[in-house]
Each structure stands twice: as structure tokens, then as C-alpha cells.
Amino acid sequence: MRLAVLSDIHGNPIALDAVLADVAGQGGVDEYLVLGDLVALGYDPITVLQRLTSLPKVGFNRGNTDRYVVTGDRPAITDQEAVIEMANSFSWTQGYVTAGGWFDWLGALPLEQRRALPDGSRLLAVHAAPGTDDGPGVNPELSDTELLQLVTDIDADLVFVGHTHWPLDLTAGRVRIVNVGSVSNPWAPDLRASYALVEAGPSGWSVHLRRVDYDRQAVINAIHGAHHPTPGFLIGWFRGERRPSWQRG
């Protein structure tokens, strides 16, 4: 049994296509698990949804930005300029997916996915952390105690998350926690896409985090070509201008 676990595609089919090509180059998989943040803060949400739903076998759960697009909720941030940029971007995406006939599909995405691996191990896939699609997520600043609290009583041996755009492979007690990073909208300094491959059989399983390069200048050009309302806000990711809070001086 082979799985590819992706998250945070953010309306970027160029990055998604690069990851799908890498999966094929690794011999393909039996199923894709996609952990949300599919459409917002990107230039072509419809193509991303078409690509993903055309895969032979694929499961989805929602991310916080998928929920924002559908419900009108917004992130709890204090930077007023970022608030305005995000509001404009989410509104544009909402109109785009509504016109394309995907609004109801997006709104029906579940909070989590579960799978049983061949050796009996229990897999849980969520966007941010068990029980939530939002918040700080699984990030390098979490203490061992905080990490253990996240996985207490979750009925899983292997947990996959995204949300923070920062790949991590951690263990809390007997639970393996893998943050697959993001397909798009990367934090500096490593601007490549990331995802995870799972190899599972009757005797156990292994997880491999992979990095994939793609044409970021083509993404920048596509953002301009899409007449997105906040091009500068999006382009910053692909020029390496964004760093997470734990990397800022």
C-alpha cells in the first residue's frame, strides 16, 4: 500500500503538477490524501480542484482557508494590511469557486480522514492538528508537553497534518506526527513544494518527506495573468519574502 499525502495547494496548479509528476516518478501510489487549503490565496483554484478530483483514488479533508471561503470566517490576525489583503483574496476565491460550481463541494469537506494500514496501524489525517483545522498547528515551537497533549486520546498511531507550511517528522509518546509541509505558498528559505510518501505493508510502514522544485517565475506570471486582486500579497511567497514567526529575528 502506497499513499501520497499533500496539503496546502492554495490554488497553484503549477506546483501541484510538479508534485504529481514526482509521485509518478516514484512509481505512483494507491491513494492520495489531501489535507486541505486547496483553493484560497492562489491564482487558479478551479484547475487545482479539477486536477485533484480526477485522480484515480483520493480523499480530502478541509483546511481553515477552505472554511473561510465558504463561511466568510477570517483569520484572527492583527496586521490590518494583511487583513484587507486576505479579505480581498478570499472574496475573489469565493466568487471563482461559486461560478465554477465548486462551492457546495468545498463546503462539504470533512474535518478529518482515517485509514487502517495493512499492519493494523491507525492513520489520522487532519489539516492543522487533531480536532481542528486552524490555530498554531504542529510547528517547531511546540514543546514536548504541548505535542503530547495534541495526540492524547486520538485513537491513531500515525498523524498527518499540514497548515504551517513547514515539514516536520516528530514523535509524541507512541504516536508519529508528520507535517507534510505545503505544495504552494512556501516559507523561505526552502521554496520547494513538499509532501509525504507512505509505504505500508503487513510488517509495518515508513514515511518519506519529499521536496520538489517547480517554476516559481511561471507562478508569478500566472498570478499577474489571472488579474488577482492582491498579486503582491501572493507573489511574496514565491520570491522568498515570507518567513514563519519562529524564523523572524
Predicted regions and their residues:
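Beta-strand-turn-beta hairpins that frame and shape the catalytic cleft
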Residues: 1-4, 114-124, 172-177, 205
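N-terminal active-site segment of His-dependent metallophosphoesterases
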Residues: 1-56, 231
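Active-site neighborhood of phospho(di)ester-bond hydrolases with catalytic His/Asp-centered motifs
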Residues: 6-7, 32-37, 59-64, 126, ...
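Active-site environment of divalent metal-dependent phosphoester hydrolases
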Residues: 10-15, 40-43, 65-70, 158-171, ...
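Glycine-rich phosphate-binding loop signature in dinucleotide/nucleotide-binding domains
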Residues: 23-29, 55, 117-119, 152-155, ...
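Acidic, His/Gly-rich catalytic cores of divalent-metal-dependent hydrolytic chemistry
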Residues: 170-249
